[in-house]
C-alpha cells in the first residue's frame, strides 16, 4: 500500500499534528468500538475517561476506560507481539475493564450470533465454535497465522484480515468478541508496519460502515465450519477500510499546519460542513479539542465572516458562509 511508504515521512515532518491525531483517534476508537456493542457513556464523560484520569462510575465507563487501556498497551509495544491465545485473552481482560468475572476467560457455554428481523423476531445468524473446542481452535488459528507470516506467500494484509474474520467466527468469549477483534486488528497491523490505527480510528470507520460490515460478515460466514466459505468479500471490505483510513490520514496531515494543530483541525472540520451544525457537533468530530477551544475557533471564524450564528442558548446553531 503506497500510503504506508509515506507514513514515516509524515511522522518525521509533522509530529505536533500527529500528537493531536493520536489523541483524537484513541477517543474515537474507545467510543466507537464500545458503541457498536451497545455500550455508551455521557458525552461529557468521554474525554475525562479516555484522556484524563477520571475514575469510572459504572460498568459502561469501566469498559470504555478498559478499551483505552488495551489500546495504550498495544501502542506502547516497542517490538511486534507474536500473536498467541494468551495475547487475545489479555486484550479481552483489558477491554472488559478487568472487573468482569470472565474477563480474559474463554466462554464456558456455547453461544449463538442472533439478529433481530424487521418484524421483531429473533433469528440465529451463525453458530460459532463450541465452548469445548474453543481453546484448541484458537491455538490452531494463532499457529496458522504465524506459519502464514513466516511463509510469506500471501500478502500480510490478507493474512491479518483472514485471522480477524476467523476470530469473529470462533467467537471465543462470552462477550466482547467484536472489541477484541478490532484490538487484534490494530495489534497485527502494527506488527507489519502499518501504523495508521494510531492516528485514524479504524473503529470509527467500522461504525460508519457497520451495515456493510455485518452484511459481509454474514455472507462470508456461510459454510465456514466446512471450510467452504467465500472470503474475498471480506478481504475487499477490509482493504477498503484501510484505504479509507490512509486517505483520511493523508488529508489530515497535509491539510493542517504544524501549529496550532488542534485549532486547524477544528477549522477544517467546520469548513467541511454542508449543513447547519452546533458546537457539540464539532466537539464530537474533534474530541481532541476542548469545548472552550471549539468556541474560540468559531468566534474567530465568525469575526472573519466565515461562519454565522443563529439563535441563542440550546437552540443556537452555526452555518458556514459560502
Regions from the PLM with identified roles:
Residues 1-322:
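FIC/Doc superfamily catalytic core
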Amino acid at each position: 500500500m503506497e500510503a504506508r511508504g509515506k507514513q514515516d515521512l509524515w511522522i518525521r515532518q509533522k509530529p505536533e499534528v500527529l500528537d493531536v491525531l493520536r489523541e483524537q483517534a484513541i477517543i474515537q476508537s474507545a467510543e466507537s468500538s464500545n458503541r457498536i456493542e451497545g455500550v455508551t457513556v455521557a458525552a461529557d464523560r468521554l474525554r475525562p475517561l479516555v484522556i484524563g484520569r477520571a475514575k469510572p462510575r459504572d460498568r459502561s465507563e469501566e469498559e470504555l476506560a478498559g478499551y483505552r487501556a488495551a489500546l495504550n498497551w498495544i501502542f506502547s509495544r516497542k517490538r511486534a507481539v507474536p500473536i498467541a491465545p494468551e495475547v487475545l485473552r489479555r486484550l479481552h481482560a483489558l477491554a472488559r475493564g478487568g472487573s468482569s468475572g470472565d474477563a480474559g476467560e474463554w466462554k464456558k457455554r456455547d453461544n449463538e450470533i442472533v439478529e433481530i428481523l424487521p418484524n421483531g423476531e429473533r433469528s440465529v445468524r451463525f453458530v460459532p465454535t463450541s465452548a469445548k473446542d474453543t481453546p484448541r481452535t484458537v491455538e490452531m488459528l494463532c499457529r496458522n497465522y504465524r506459519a502464514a507470516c513466516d511463509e510469506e506467500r500471501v500478502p500480510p494484509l490478507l493474512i491479518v484480515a483472514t485471522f480477524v474474520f476467523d476470530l469473529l467466527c470462533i467467537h471465543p468469549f462470552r462477550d466482547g468478541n467484536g472489541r477484541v477483534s478490532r484490538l487484534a486488528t490494530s495489534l497485527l497491523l502494527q506488527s507489519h508496519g502499518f501504523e495508521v490505527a494510531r492516528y485514524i480510528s479504524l473503529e470509527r470507520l467500522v461504525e460508519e460502515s457497520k451495515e456493510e460490515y455485518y452484511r459481509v460478515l454474514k455472507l462470508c460466514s456461510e459454510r465456514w465450519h466446512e471450510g467452504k466459505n467465500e472470503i474475498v468479500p471480506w478481504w475487499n471490505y477490509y482493504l477498503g477500510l484501510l484505504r479509507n483510513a490512509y486517505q483520511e490520514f493523508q488529508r489530515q496531515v497535509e491539510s493542517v499546519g504544524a501549529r496550532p494543530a488542534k485549532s486547524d483541525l477544528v477549522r477544517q472540520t467546520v469548513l467541511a460542513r454542508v449543513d447547519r451544525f452546533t458546537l457539540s457537533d464539532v466537539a464530537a468530530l474533534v474530541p481532541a479539542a476542548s469545548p472552550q477551544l471549539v468556541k474560540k475557533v468559531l468566534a474567530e471564524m465568525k469575526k472573519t465572516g466565515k461562519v454565522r450564528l443563529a439563535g441563542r442558548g440550546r437552540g443556537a446553531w452555526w452555518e458556514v458562509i459560502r
